[in-house]
Amino acid sequence: YLNTYVQLVKPAERWKDMAHGHELYCAGHLMEAAVAYTRATGKELLLEVARKFAERIDADFGPGKRLDPCGHPEIELALVELGRFTGEPRFAKLARFFVDQRGSTQGRTSFGEYAQDHRLVREQTEIVGHAVRAMYLYSGMADVAAYFRDETLLRPSFAIWRDLIETKTYVTGGIGSSAANEGFTKAYDLPNDTAYCETCASIGMLLWNHRLFLATGRSDVLDVVEKELYNGIPSGLALAGDRFFYGNPLASRGDHERVPWFDCSCCPTNLARTLPSVGQYVYATGPERLYVALFAQSRADRKSTRLNSSH
């Protein structure tokens, strides 16, 4: 177990506030960081920390153990990534457990629509609640669907996707029109000057749509990936790289400016990990296939195949 706040400030509060404590959320980001660090450096020290943490979570949560998911999804996609990278299927199985627990309120109080906990994910058809929570949950859902080849997760995924794309997405790719819940309201409620459009939500759109592409090979989701990379995400960062938007409204009376930092600085740190990873979205491989997913000046080498793109 690793959570500096709980361990140093409230050591008796482990797993006590699943709705708002963000323990599994933070664990998921640690796992993602560990995989990225090992890929970049070949060093496995942080990966071993993440593996031990995942083993602790697997010992505490699951059938016959704790059944409650985290109020802020993230652990789901991270466990699949850790499972793929380490070759340990039990982590992906734990991710599937957390996905299926969303909306199942056996022995606990529901987190409600805000955390997409109002209905089992396999029964959901509409995008609701907190935008970033939704993107991370459905990214994990797509990962689980791809890992286990589970079409029953892909069908609701695309029902939710259509509702989002057709009725609740701005022309910039921004999502989440309301600051009140940092998320969604009703269909076509897309005001310009009060648009919330959190930077992290656009990054979440990138993550989810890229995963839907990897799971299905569909090109329409790549249009969304491209829109987020060119529009939804960059607006959150000043050209000098030293000031940030948390929300990205489409209109301003001059009173909305980028700032150096926030009390809750998820957006700057999310940008810091996203921009260096753009290369991973350009190409993909499948059985006897090589996909060019984005038109970008790039080069790819894979075994006997070399591609050069000057777009």
Positions of predicted regions on the chain:
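Glycan-recognition and catalytic cores of secretory/periplasmic carbohydrate-active enzymes
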Residues: 1-309
